[in-house]
Amino acid sequence: MIKLKEELFQKNHKILTYAIFFVVILLLEYCAPQVQSAKLKNGDLLFVTAKETGLSGAINNVTQKQKEASFDHIGIVEKAENHWYVLHAAPKGGSQKQELKSFLTDQSDEDQKVMIYRLKPEYQRSIPAALKKAESMLGKPYNFNYILDENSYYCSDYIERSFRKDHIFKLEPMTFIDPKTGETNTFWMEFYKKKNLKVPEGEPGCNPNGLAASDKLEKIGEL
């Protein structure tokens, strides 16, 4: 009889342990996005750190402005009906409104970090109009040529246009020169050759590193 009670106790203890573990996992999954979003404010800009290779590395090689961090993607945060979203233009999906949790998962899967930047107080009034403009540009395809047009957008282009009315960011002459060699970066030479296009050196454009360097922004921290 005593042995039977001990076996029942051990069995129940094991079930209880599994149940507690399962509840803890659920709580962690629920609380993580809450902790992350607690840092955010409507209109914050999320910058994604650059990779060292491929398209990401090629963009960074000719645009990096900061030693401590470099970026290859950007989106703007919007809170709607108690849910957080990221409005951004990406190669997969074009201009889109993505749930924050999904956006962060995508970056985590690529081992990229997400940094929060915020408009300084004197520029915060630009956010409502910028979000409205960003919403109006949803659904457009991604601009794979990185040459400005009205029918497709790349990531920093999408954000610059969102704030263009208030001149928060500015277009600058693009460069595809590798600072190490003083010559056009090999990646970009091949990139535009395959598209039968001339490298758009000097044409107006923007990039995540240029936007992050704006004196109208302040860095909040990592998300």
Predicted ranges, named:
Residues 111-175:
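Active-site nucleophile-His-acid catalytic modules used for acyl/amide transfer and hydrolysis
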Residues 51-118, 142-150:
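Glycine-rich catalytic cores of cysteine/serine-nucleophile enzymes that process amide/ester linkages
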Residues 6-19:
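N-terminal Sec-pathway targeting helices
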Residues 146, 150-223:
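Activation targets extended, charge/polar-rich intrinsically disordered C-terminal tails
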